Amino acid sequence: MFAFICLLAIASAIDFNTWASKNNKHFTAIEKLRRRAIFNMNAKFVDSFNKIGSFKLSVDGPFAAMTNEEYRTLLKSKRTTEENGQVKYLNIQAPESVDWRKEGKVTPIRDQAQCGSCYTFGSLAALEGRLLIEKGGDANTLDLSEEHMVQCTRDNGNNGCNGGLGSNVYDYIIEHGVAKESDYPYTGSDSTCKTNVKSFAKITGYTKVPRNNEAELKAALSQGLVDVSIDASSAKFQLYKSGAYTDTKCKNNYFALNHEVCAVGYGVVDGKECWIVRNSWGTGWGDKGYINMVIEGNTCGVATDPLYPTGVQYL
């Protein structure tokens, strides 16, 4: 019996070590013991859920050795006041499904790392997509600078690596434009805004999709990518792997939204109609960086506060 218990412990340690190597995680000896224990706790939760759940979880992703409380501290796109903005009804019949990835209009998955900069990744992913759709270009090489927005949008109401809103990013781009990644590389840290960087793209405005209106969000997605915000605080979201995600504990009211992402389409997954949502946590999280979120019931608030840039242009 003792030998069997030892074998279980070794197997678990190997699993943890493999995860740490894959995710480039390094810990002190004492911290490693704690992280392994959390990893094993999460692995047990994943195994239990996957036996009964309608979608799949995994401990492959970057947050497998974090408690849910620790993970939630990373979610920085929080709202303290109601936002106003131009709301537009498209009033068009959207197609049954849309997936801009299949059209080559979605740039590769990015990784925001430990910086609370999701608001820059969600908003710029939508801008990149709409530039590709409306003005052309190569999805594999188009890369706008999130660092530019992290460092330079404080006067617009954002807070660097401690969170912000995509609408503030768009306000900045309307006036100043946004640089290329190669001219203003991502460091995932706060620093002073560089004012001598050449802008590569600009917008003339942005539009808010009518709140909680799934038909209008589909219509907006039929024309291009949309910046959306969600409640990502659940352990199930933290450890999501694949399938049609839904969670009754997840909130969809405006002030519960805490993570900004980008919707790239919608379609049927495992028999359920879902939004196709692009995250900014690298390809190791979720379904190669994506999550399929059930449309019915406005899961986690996808349709609560969507917006997209207008008048997109290269400079």
From Swiss-Prot:
Recorded GO MF terms: cysteine-type endopeptidase activity
Catalytic activity: Hydrolysis of proteins, including basement membrane collagen and azocasein. Preferential cleavage: Arg-Arg-|-Xaa in small molecule substrates including Z-Arg-Arg-|-NHMec
Signal peptide range: 1-13
Propeptide: 14-93
One annotated GO biological process: proteolysis involved in protein catabolic process
PANTHER family: CYSTEINE PROTEASE FAMILY C1-RELATED
Similarity comment: family membership: Belongs to the peptidase C1 family.
UniProt name for this protein: Cysteine proteinase 2
Protein's organism: Entamoeba histolytica (strain ATCC 30459 / HM-1:IMSS / ABRM)
Source taxonomy: Eukaryota, Amoebozoa, Evosea, Archamoebae, Mastigamoebida
